A protein has these predicted regions:
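Short basic helix-loop element that most often maps to the first helix and adjoining turn
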Residues: 3-22, 74-77
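Residues in the recognition helix of alpha-helical DNA-binding motifs
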Residues: 8, 22-23, 33, 62
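Recognition helix of helix-turn-helix/homeodomain-like DNA-binding domains
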Residues: 25-38
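DNA major-groove recognition helix of helix-turn-helix/homeodomain DNA-binding modules
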Residues: 43-58
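Short, charged recognition helix plus adjacent turn
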Residues: 60-79
């Protein structure tokens, strides 16, 4: 999932470590979030939204490739 975390963090002059301390997570977690290797849990997404005073959907953006195409149907489940 794409996100604006790096931009928001840098606008505040914070390092990844400083943001991690604010959130109660590791610096590695912040790095993984910023690079899109990790999607946040819902509680973490809410903490980020409160911290940056923005709606979650203005911080996180679904990957276009991950979105099902309009009119597409889910694949049938194997039985």
């Amino acid at each position: 999932m794409d996100n604006d975390l790096r931009v928001l963090r840098e606008q505040r002059g914070w390092t990844q470590g400083a943001l991690a301390d604010e959130l109660g997570v590791s610096r590695q977690t912040v790095n993984a979030l910023e690079t899109g290797r990790y999607d946040p849990s819902l509680p973490l997404a809410f903490r980020l939204a409160r911290l940056f005073d923005r709606p979650i959907e203005s911080i996180f953006h679904p990957d276009e490739e991950a979105r099902p195409h309009e009119g597409a149907h889910p694949a049938p489940r194997a039985r």
